[in-house]
C-alpha cells in the first residue's frame, strides 16, 4: 500500500502556498496525498485549481478570535464538530503523518492527529506565532519556522524561507500576455508592481485610483483582487488575479509595493527585488505584518511606510530613496542566507517523518 500524508492549512493564500509546493514532490515519490480544509475556503479553490491528484476532505470550521464575540459561542460547536470529523477522517485514512501550514481550519486536524498518535509537523511563516499555531505547537512533533523565534522552544527548527521563485528571468516561460502589456508601457519610466494580497489590495487600488498622476511618473501594474477594475491602458495594467504571470510580472517590475505577508516578502528577497512594504496594521491583523516589515527594514532588505502615512508626497519620497540606494539594497538581499530551496525542505521533512515513525 502507498504511504499516505495528510495536509491542512487555509483561510488565506499564505496558508496554502507551501503545501502546494510540497504536495507534487510527495505525489512524485508515490505518496497518496489527502487534504483537510474548508470546502468554502481558499484552500479548496487552490487545490482544485492546481489539478493535483489530491483527495480533499471538508470539515466544519470556526474562527479563532482573541476578543469576545457572540460568534465565539457558535464557533465552539463548529470547532468541536471539525475535531470529530477530523478524528473520523484520520482514523479511516491512517496516514503516516500530518503537515499543517496554519490558519484556524488547521487546529482540529492537528489535535485529532495527535490524539490518534500520528506525527504532526507544522510551519510558521511569521516573526511571531499566530493563535492557531500557538495551539497547534502544543500538539506538534516539530515546528519549522521561517524566522528565528525569540522564545527558546524545544520543538522548533529554524528553517528559513522556502520559495521556488526564478532568480533568472530567462528561465521564465514566455507570455504573449506580458508582451501585450509591454506595448502600453514606456521604456523611459520605472515600472512599479502593487501586490496587496487577499486582505490588503483595497488600499493600493484606492491609492492608484485617487492619484492618476502616478501614471505620468511610472508604469503601474496593480494586482487588484477585483475583476471590475481590470484595465490595460497607457502606463497602467490592472488585473484581478494572476497565476503563471505572477513571477514574470515580478521580474518585469523595477520595484514592488507590497503588504507585509511573509510569503511575498521572502519571494522578493529570493529575487533580490527592490521593494517598499506597507504592512497591514493591528486594526486589520494581529500585528504580524508590522513585525515582518520591521525585520526586513532592520536587515536592510527593504523600506517600510505605514498605511496611515501612504500619501503621494511620502510615496514619492520613498521611491526616490529606494532607487537612490538600489545597489545597496540589492547587494544586501543577494548576500542573504535566509532562503532555502523546496527540495531542501522536502528532504528534511521526509527525514523527520521517517524518524518520527521509527520512534513510535
Swiss-Prot record:
Membrane-spanning parts: none
Main location: membrane
The protein's annotated pathway: Cell wall biogenesis; peptidoglycan biosynthesis
Catalytic reaction annotation: Mur2Ac(oyl-L-Ala-gamma-D-Glu-L-Lys-D-Ala-D-Ala)-di-trans,octa-cis-undecaprenyl diphosphate + UDP-N-acetyl-alpha-D-glucosamine = beta-D-GlcNAc-(1->4)-Mur2Ac(oyl-L-Ala-gamma-D-Glu-L-Lys-D-Ala-D-Ala)-di-trans,octa-cis-undecaprenyl diphosphate + UDP + H(+)
GO BP terms, alphabetized: carbohydrate metabolic process; cell division; cell wall organization; lipid glycosylation; peptidoglycan biosynthetic process; regulation of cell shape
Classification via InterPro entries: GlcNAc_MurG, Glyco_trans_28_C, GlycoTrans_28_N
Transcription regulation is among the record's keywords: no
Keyword Transmembrane: no
Keywords: Cell cycle, Cell division, Cell membrane, Cell shape, Cell wall biogenesis/degradation, Glycosyltransferase, Membrane, Peptidoglycan synthesis, Transferase
Single GO MF descriptor: undecaprenyldiphospho-muramoylpentapeptide beta-N-acetylglucosaminyltransferase activity
Enzyme kind, highest EC tier: transferase
Binding residue positions for UDP-N-acetyl-alpha-D-glucosamine: 198, 289
Stored HAMAP family: MurG
Function: Cell wall formation. Catalyzes the transfer of a GlcNAc subunit on undecaprenyl-pyrophosphoryl-MurNAc-pentapeptide (lipid intermediate I) to form undecaprenyl-pyrophosphoryl-MurNAc-(pentapeptide)GlcNAc (lipid intermediate II).
UniProt protein name: UDP-N-acetylglucosamine--N-acetylmuramyl-(pentapeptide) pyrophosphoryl-undecaprenol N-acetylglucosamine transferase
Encoding gene per record: murG
Amino acid at each position: 500500500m502507498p504511504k499516505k500524508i495528510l495536509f491542512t492549512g487555509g483561510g488565506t493564500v499564505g496558508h496554502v502556498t507551501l503545501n502546494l509546493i510540497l504536495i507534487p514532490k510527495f505525489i512524485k515519490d508515490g505518496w497518496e496525498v489527502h487534504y483537510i480544509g474548508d470546502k468554502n475556503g481558499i484552500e479548496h479553490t487552490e487545490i482544485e485549481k492546481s489539478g493535483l491528484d489530491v483527495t480533499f476532505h471538508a470539515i466544519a470550521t470556526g474562527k479563532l478570535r482573541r476578543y469576545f464575540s457572540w460568534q465565539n459561542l457558535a464557533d465552539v460547536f463548529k470547532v468541536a464538530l471539525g475535531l470529530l470529523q477530523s478524528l473520523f477522517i484520520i482514523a479511516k485514512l491512517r496516514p503516516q503523518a500530518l503537515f499543517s501550514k496554519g490558519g484556524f481550519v488547521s487546529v482540529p486536524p492537528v489535535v485529532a492527529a495527535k490524539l490518534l498518535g500520528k506525527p504532526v509537523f507544522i510551519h510558521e511563516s511569521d516573526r511571531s506565532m499566530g493563535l492557531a499555531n500557538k495551539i497547534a505547537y502544543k500538539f506538534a512533533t516539530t515546528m519549522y519556522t521561517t524566522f528565528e523565534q525569540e522564545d527558546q522552544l524545544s520543538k522548533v527548527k529554524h528553517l528559513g524561507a522556502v520559495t521556488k521563485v526564478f532568480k533568472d528571468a530567462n528561465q521564465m516561460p514566455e507570455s504573449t500576455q506580458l508582451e501585450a502589456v509591454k506595448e502600453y508601457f514606456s521604456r523611459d519610466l520605472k515600472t512599479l508592481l502593487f501586490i496587496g494580497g487577499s486582505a490588503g489590495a483595497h488600499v493600493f487600488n484606492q491609492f492608484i485610483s485617487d492619484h492618476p498622476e502616478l501614471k505620468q511618473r511610472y508604469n503601474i501594474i496593480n494586482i487588484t483582487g477585483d475583476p471590475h477594475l481590470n484595465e490595460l491602458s497607457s502606463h497602467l495594467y490592472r488585473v484581478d488575479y494572476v497565476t503563471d504571470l505572477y513571477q514574470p510580472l515580478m521580474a518585469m517590475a523595477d520595484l514592488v509595493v507590497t503588504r507585509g505577508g511573509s510569503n511575498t516578502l521572502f519571494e522578493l528577497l529570493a529575487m533580490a527585488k527592490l521593494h517598499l512594504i506597507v504592512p497591514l496594521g493591528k486594526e486589520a491583523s494581529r500585528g504580524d505584518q508590522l513585525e515582518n516589515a520591521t525585520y526586513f527594514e532592520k536587515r536592510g532588505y527593504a523600506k517600510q511606510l505605514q498605511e496611515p502615512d501612504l500619501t503621494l508626497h511620502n510615496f514619492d519620497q520613498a521611491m526616490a530613496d529606494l532607487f537612490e540606494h538600489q545597489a545597496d539594497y540589492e547587494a544586501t538581499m543577494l548576500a542573504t542566507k535566509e532562503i532555502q530551496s523546496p527540495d531542501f525542505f522536502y528532504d528534511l521533512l521526509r527525514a523527520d517523518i521517517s524518524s518520527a515513525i521509527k520512534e513510535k
